[in-house]
Regions:
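Aromatic/hydrophobic pocket-lining residues that form π-stacking "cages" and hydrophobic walls in ligand
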Residues: 25, 55, 122
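Divalent metal-dependent hydrolysis catalytic cores, especially in the metallo-beta-lactamase
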Residues: 12, 25-51, 66-78, 94-108, ...
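Histidine/acidic residue-rich metal-binding segments in metalloenzymes
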Residues: 1, 84-100, 106-169
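Short, well-ordered amphipathic alpha-helices
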Residues: 52-60, 157
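Metal-dependent catalytic neighborhoods of phosphoester/phosphodiester hydrolases
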Residues: 47-55, 83-86
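Short, acidic/polar
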Residues: 19-26, 80-91
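Short secondary-structure boundary/capping elements
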Residues: 17-21, 50-51, 81, 114, ...
Length: 170
């Protein structure tokens, strides 16, 4: 074999937004991609299985006729995410992962995690469910240079999560 052709690749980080904004872009993504990881940082964020399922229905309704596009839904982790919600997500085939947004680091992250230990019960459930953890890896410490925020996140937060949850898919 000398050549590989990807006819319908996957998009592993897609912001579709919602409403009219989503309707204006989802068709283009669906024509180019077979599947996509749908980012949950809407306003309000997609924090529950029922919200993810409703958002997926909105996406599917906006797709062009006969589209085979498969949106893979993601839950937005908060300090209040409970293991039962993760277990329910693990049982829902349309939900692929959950995402950690540190509070205040990016668009619509105000509801994000204030301290990673607050989501340890949810991470334990994710490890049991074999659900991937997606990460917006950045700290908000004003003492940390903007160009160092990702590396500091890895050193101070992610390394600890990897150590504490060795079976978690990150």
């Amino acid at each position: 074999m000398t050549r590989i052709s990807l006819i319908k690749p996957d998009d592993w980080h897609l912001h579709l937004r919602s409403g009219e904004a989503m309707k204006s872009v989802v068709g283009m993504s669906a024509r180019q991609m077979g599947r996509a990881i749908i980012m949950p940082n809407l306003s309000p964020p997609v924090k529950s299985v029922s919200q993810a399922q409703a958002y997926r229905k909105e996406i599917m309704k906006a797709l062009p006729t006969n589209s085979s596009f498969n949106p893979l839904m993601v839950l937005y982790l908060t300090d209040g995410t409970v293991p039962k919600e993760i277990e329910a997500a693990g049982a829902a085939p349309e939900i692929y992962a959950a995402k950690l947004y540190p509070a205040g680091v990016t668009t619509n992250s105000d509801n994000g995690v204030t301290n990673v230990t607050n989501i340890y019960p949810a991470l334990e459930a994710m490890q049991k469910e074999e659900m991937p953890l997606l990460v917006h890896g950045e700290v908000t410490d004003p003492e940390v240079d903007v160009f160092d925020r990702e590396s500091v996140f890895i050193e101070k937060i992610l390394d600890r999560v990897v150590k504490d949850f060795p079976g978690l898919k990150i």
